[in-house]
Amino acid sequence: MRVASIIINRPAKQLHKPLSYLLPEKFGDVKAGTRVLVPLGGSREEGILIGYEELLEKPTFTLRSIIDILDSDPWFTREMMDTAQKISRYFLCSFGDALRLFTVHKTLKSYDAPKEEWLVVTPEFKIDQLSPKKRKQRELANYLIEVGGAPKSLLRAKGYSYMVIKQVGEEHGIHIEERFKDTKTSFTELLSGEETIPLTEAQQIVYEPIKQMMDLESYNTFLLHGVTGSGKTQIYLKAAARCIGKGKTAIILVPEIILTDQIVRRFVSTFGDEVVVFHSKLTISERNNNWERIRRKDSHIIIGARSAVFAPAEDIGLIVLDEEHDTSYKQEDMIRYNAKNVALWRGMAHDCPVILGSATPAITSYYKALQGQYKLLELPTRIFDQPMPNVQIVDMKEEMIRGNYSVFSDAMTHLIERTLADGNQMIILLNRRGYSTFVMCRDCGETIMCPHCEVAMVYHQAGEELRCHYCEHHEPIPSVCPKCQSKRIKFFGSGTQKVEEELRRHFKGARIARLDQDVTKHKDMGEEILQDFGKHKYDILLGTQMVSKGHDFKDVTAVGILTADSVLNIPVYSASERAFDLLTQTSGRAGRGDKVGSVVIQTYNPLNYAIIKSKAHDYLGFYNEEIVNRKDLGYPPFREMIYMVIRHAKEEMAESISQKIVDDLETNFKSPSIDVNGPYEAGIKKIRDMYRLSIMIRGENLDAVKDYIYNSWIFTQEGLLIDVDPI
């Protein structure tokens, strides 16, 4: 008699543990990771077979039988299931939810391996069909004439927009064909191709231990600390070439979708069709296609945001996290996993090196490197000894004393004017989208709030509306105060839309592009703006933090940071670290070409150590001060943290449930090394009509607390969000 462990494929907390079913002999040997059909209550459900065992004696309880086997081949490898189990137990989510991270769809839907659409040129096509004004279309057509044809996925990776590809594909003499991908790459050729990727002497020293671990097929975590512009990407390219030369797969992670375009261009120019891209802006068809290319081992370099760490590669030889400090690697909704943890678990399972690269490593990562848990590699200077940019800190209190109430200090204005006069480019950071940050009545002081969330509505000039950035509720701008009927309504604060307007008014003739979430929600818009900025079609790039990292524009000689305090003042233990990262990373965009860069940072806290150290590009100085504060206050890396939020439509029920959880935990964990704090109001009391209370648990080791929560009623409590290792 065979008894199988089955995870039900339904996102229900009550089904977070495997259920037992009989595995009839008629199904023969069924491999772990295969989908099955099982009875559950009065219905039939899809499940995943985790494994089975032979029982010599009949169990004393009744078991129902598996109805059918749904796949001839497993959906999940043993490594994927083991990693999902680690995610489930560490981040406190259901096993089924963790497994679904390894799939394209939220549900495990079977599909045939799709074909790729190719654009193919025939002799009937003439380049003169295309107007000279259609520059991108002609550029693409000339490329197709040169190579004969190419898959749409490759053209997208090369930077051609969906619309350009569509228009060229509709031209007479260019056909769209569906083809199965036929990969004939020679791994020997790729290995020899590694020699064509040059490294400086400093880069070669850093690369050698990584190469050694790949040759030994041995796991190790390398923390690559290299200042901005030191050439970390070149090391990633070199390591990836060696990895795929050995017939293995490399996973390259970047924190933001917007950053995939530049790094994809670097990799595609080196490896061509070996590169496959993953991020959330891809269509389901594109994701299916890319997923299958990996499963069929047609592509061996995977580039993408955090979800790319779950790519179904069975022969991983290298994992890279670029900008490893970035908070975007932590998913903040649904399953709150950190891609860094997953990368380390997968690297360990595949016996391959993991590279964590950053100019501003996470405090916890640098601490682990100094403790010997990671191997520290350093690139302390820019490539070809380019100087770091000159940074000026401006005290905005002094500006106000002098009568300057503008969003631009005198120093910022002069920097913009000089940059434009010299024909160079500038990046300006304002980490706040929208037009005005809140709207208030000047008679009664009423701030217009979201009716579903206890947050102020933000004015967006596009559409002339107020919008909530938490639930996306939007409404027209009121003509009178909803409380006192006064018409004296004023817009306060400055978002990216308002600053863009100010720039256009003060610097007439300047070509300005804005990059924020309101822009990038439109497919391809973000990457097109960055491509055009790289071609110097714009003089100024204004945006939120997505302009701060990973970009390499040779004509950018100036960077302006309008409000350094917006990050310093967020109510999290890592606020100083986030501020130092943002200021240093943004400053590092300046002077990456032949010209020295200049940076102006505006702040109301010029003596804050994060700002002072970022001016000097002094990571070690910042680390030494921050780590002392962390130890004194009991924050990571010295203590672990679990943050809980209890949500309920009724405020009194949220209070009751949260107090019950606190009482339970305090009863079971009376150790002085574990603190249970709360319940108290969450940072935002109400979101989407749900009241929110929070609980914080801290301790040197919280493994026992996690195990208890996972196996208790707390785990299945409706409306409970659990955030392990909040950042």
Where are these regions (language model features)?
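Short, charged low-complexity linear motifs
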Residues: I6-I8, R418, N677
